[in-house]
From Swiss-Prot:
Signal peptide (from-to): none
GO cellular component: ribonucleoprotein complex; ribosome
GO terms for biological process, alphabetical: translation
Protein name as it appears in the record: Small ribosomal subunit protein eS1
HAMAP family in the record: Ribosomal_eS1
GO molecular function, one term: structural constituent of ribosome
Superkingdom to which the source organism belongs: Archaea
Alphabetized InterPro entries for the sequence: Ribosomal_eS1, Ribosomal_eS1_arc
Species: Methanosphaerula palustris (strain ATCC BAA-1556 / DSM 19958 / E1-9c)
Keywords, in A-Z order: Ribonucleoprotein, Ribosomal protein
């Protein structure tokens, strides 16, 4: 004989939980990005929330930028986050690929001035097809410039350079002297570890 579902107990469990409004960091305007539920606020720390830069900035042109935030502290019914990475949507990346051109990916690992160990993926799109030596030269310039930028700045400055596109524009200015370049994008960023500075 099948057991009856304990509906009453399940309802009581939900009643024991509370809703918390989740906010992005001050650098992104401290905008609320949704709500999450937990029985204990301590269980929220470390939880990851996702949204788009378009939703945060109320700018449809930035809907292709997916943002990830991790809850770092809770005060009352408010949960505050830190930015832990971004990624461009696959549809957007496909739209950048053109025939008879080259796509050049560079992977950069480095530590920021404030001790964040990060992994960045930078993609370069050329105007015409590049040969292997040209691809190697382009990748070297991008990797060197990005590694220097990361090492000389804190995580907040690196994030600002990524989401505003300023670092992509700086790299484009350097690389287009080597080969005709259409676009450079930091397509993905990710924190690999927590702060490592004592």
């Amino acid at each position: 004989m099948a057991k009856k579902k304990q509906i009453g107990r399940r309802v009581e469990g939900w009643k024991a939980k509370s809703w918390y409004k989740v906010y992005v960091p001050e650098a992104f305007g401290s905008t609320p990005i949704g709500e999450t539920i937990a029985a204990d606020s301590a269980n929220l720390v470390g939880r990851v929330m996702s949204t788009t830069l378009g939703e945060i900035a109320q700018d449809f042109a930035k809907q292709h930028i997916k943002m990830k935030f991790k809850i770092s502290r809770v005060a009352g019914d408010a949960a505050y986050t830190e930015f832990i990475g971004h990624e461009l949507t696959k549809d957007y990346l496909r739209s950048l690929v053109k025939r008879r051109t080259s796509r050049i990916d560079s992977h950069i690992m480095g530590s920021t001035k404030d001790g964040k160990r990060i992994h960045l993926t930078v993609t370069c799109y050329t105007l015409i097809g590049a040969n292997s030596s040209q691809i190697h030269a382009i990748r070297n310039v991008i990797s060197a410039q990005m590694a220097t930028f990361v090492a000389q700045n804190d995580w907040a400055t690196v994030v600002d350079g990524i989401v505003t596109g300023s670092i992509s524009r700086d790299m484009l200015a350097q690389v287009k002297g080597i080969f005709p370049i259409r676009r450079i994008e930091v397509i993905k960023s990710k924190i690999e570890s927590k702060v490592i500075i004592a």
